[in-house]
Structure formats: C-alpha cells, structure tokens
C-alpha cells in the first residue's frame, strides 16, 4: 500500500534513484553496506549544523566518491577549505580507499523533506510547541512551490503521559501514484520526556518518462450512445404525442366484453 511503504523505495527506478550506487559480490556486499551505514551516521553527527539533506556514496574502481547535499555548503567546507580536508582524511581512514568529497547546494531547503524534519526536531528540542513548528514548516513549503505537504509527529507530544500521533496535510500528497515526485524525510527529537519522531512527505509534481507526454483531453461528442441500445432505434412510443401513446393520459379504459353488443341492440 502506498500509505504504508517507504515512498523512496516504492519509486526506485521510476522517479527516484539509489543513495548507494555500487556493485559487489556476495562476499563483500554485507561489509560494504555496513560501511555505508557507518559513514552516513558519522556524517550526520559531524555535520549536524550544516543542514545535510542526503548523502550519495559511489565506489568506482577501488575509490569512493561521496556527494553531500547541503543547504549550507560553507559550513561543510570551512574556512579556506580546512574542514573539508579534515573530513576527507577521516573518511579515507574509515573506508580504507581514496575518497573524493563533493558538495552540492540545496537551493530550496524549505521544500526538502529531510531538512524540514530536522528543523522541526530541533525546534521540539528547544521546547517549541509542535503544532506551531509543523504549521510554520507547511506554510513555508507551500509558499516556495510545493504542491502538497504532510507532516506527522509521534510520541509524548507536549510532555503528556500517553503517547499519541498527530498529523497535518496541506495540498495534494498522492502516495499511490508512481510518477508523483514525493520527497520523504524522517528525524527524531531527543526531549526530556522521550523521543519524538517526525515524518515529512513533500509532493513536488509529477515526473514524465522518456516516452510520456502530457495528457490532452479530446472533446467529447455531444450525442452519447446509451449503453445496450443501438443509436438508430428508439423505444416503442418515443416521439409520439402524449395522447396517442399506449396507456397514456388520453387512452381510455378497455371496454368490458359484450359492451359493443349491448350498445348495438
């Protein structure tokens, strides 16, 4: 079901792409996958204040190429590129191969689902009301071009004893449509009452494939055929004056048998 499945995994090879782009045999696959998970966790902690949306890892020919998508690339690079060099050295030590790090800027962070989720969790950790944070994020996303957004928060909201889930939606979020460009993000806020999870879905429009074209509606015929009846035929009695129809308003009752005979006598 589109409501339950992960939106990115549901649309892989249709409108989304993998975050790890490499091939490995059965003996090396598990180790490389674990390495990717550890690298992403390290970058998430290291670049917590750099507004990192996603990390793409590629492994071409005994090398590694890591692309970091951030709305604040200056924080990642640092003064005169010092921070990026230290980050590259640490990644090479962890992965054991030469690493190339690329930084890509996110032009509209207000419509990036992961950055929206991170922003809401940071506000929750600063004791800001969750409804205010969610509605403000939705307004900013719709103002900057998103066609729909849905935000869900789960946990001990506002410190209540029983955990609950609340969500808000604005615009359209068609989760069942494969061609729909749905951006999904998830983040957790560590509060004094416990962990609050935040999920964000952002609908940015539809993707058109290589051979697809916009649908053009053809003008419908004014005269439509009724199902089950040929067009040239009509029912018995149609088109006649009301008084001449059988059983109509002008038709009299049938005479009783023998009435003509009595009248002729």
Curated annotation (Swiss-Prot):
Transmembrane segments: none annotated. Keywords: Ribonucleoprotein, Ribosomal protein, RNA-binding, rRNA-binding. One of its GO terms (cellular component) is cytosolic small ribosomal subunit. Residues 221-239 have a biased composition (Basic and acidic residues). Residues 211-265 are annotated as: Disordered. InterPro entries: KH_dom, KH_dom-like_a/b, KH_dom_type_2, KH_sf_prok-type, Ribosomal_S3_C_sf, Ribosomal_uS3_bac-typ, Ribosomal_uS3_C, Ribosomal_uS3_CS. Residues 39-107 form the KH type-2 domain. It comes from the Bacteria. GO terms for molecular function: mRNA binding; rRNA binding; structural constituent of ribosome. PROSITE patterns: KH_TYPE_2, RIBOSOMAL_S3. GO terms for biological process: translation. Part of the 30S ribosomal subunit. Forms a tight complex with proteins S10 and S14. Binds the lower part of the 30S subunit head. Binds mRNA in the 70S ribosome, positioning it for translation. Belongs to the universal ribosomal protein uS3 family. This is Small ribosomal subunit protein uS3. It comes from Cupriavidus metallidurans (strain ATCC 43123 / DSM 2839 / NBRC 102507 / CH34) (Ralstonia metallidurans).
